[in-house]
């Protein structure tokens, strides 16, 4: 029996319609491809710090079980597998899973991709050292229930990395007007600005879910270099957080 779900069917349908585009760096997921190096820098730094891993080692994350929730086509799952993690990629959109499986197979990677939800994984007793929760929380129907399921998925002392979009006039101008309406990097309607979450709101939700926030940084786009970088101060549009489940 399926656990109570926070999945928003309309949000899932948006990403199902774009499933074949995941590994096209010039397609509908171009913004994620551009952002990915910045996301990976933050994720790897946080995992290395939390679990005392040497990133110069051949497989620094060997022995860590990692869940990439809302994995899409595997843009984060694959780099984590290359670093040695035992990766489960989960997505509520059924069409994303065969795309992710095929690309992993072509890349010579072993990744356990599943069409499932955080709630169902938690109900099944699955537990992980790391949960990646990237650009998902703004698409769910009940953020607190969803984050609570993510906490249940973590082993004591486990790490959750969560990224999302701030809610303010600047984020509307850049993420909605700029990215969807003008530049057409994403189809119109990909994001619902009213579902964006401020950093303080997210910290409050994370604490209510039973996790301890330990870090947050902005992810800032430079339109001149067309690259992303981490910022300690600018969380005005995209930002990322790290939280741990108490031991």
UniProtKB/Swiss-Prot annotation:
Annotated metabolic or biological route of this protein: Cofactor biosynthesis; ubiquinone biosynthesis
Gene Ontology molecular function, alphabetical: 2-polyprenyl-6-hydroxyphenol methylase activity; 3-demethylubiquinol 3-O-methyltransferase activity; polyprenyldihydroxybenzoate methyltransferase activity
Catalytic reaction(s) noted: a 3-demethylubiquinol + S-adenosyl-L-methionine = a ubiquinol + S-adenosyl-L-homocysteine + H(+); a 3-(all-trans-polyprenyl)benzene-1,2-diol + S-adenosyl-L-methionine = a 2-methoxy-6-(all-trans-polyprenyl)phenol + S-adenosyl-L-homocysteine + H(+)
GO BP terms, alphabetized: methylation
Pfam families: Methyltransf_23
Binding positions (S-adenosyl-L-methionine): 39, 70, 91, 134
Gene3D superfamilies the UniProt entry points to: Vaccinia Virus protein VP39
EC number: 2.1.1.222, 2.1.1.64
Keyword Zinc attributed: no
Keyword check for Methyltransferase: yes
Keywords (A to Z) from UniProt: Methyltransferase, S-adenosyl-L-methionine, Transferase, Ubiquinone biosynthesis
Job of this protein: O-methyltransferase that catalyzes the 2 O-methylation steps in the ubiquinone biosynthetic pathway.
Membership in a protein family: Belongs to the methyltransferase superfamily. UbiG/COQ3 family.
Name of the protein described by the UniProt record: Ubiquinone biosynthesis O-methyltransferase
Classification of source organism: Bacteria, Pseudomonadati, Pseudomonadota, Alphaproteobacteria, Rhodobacterales
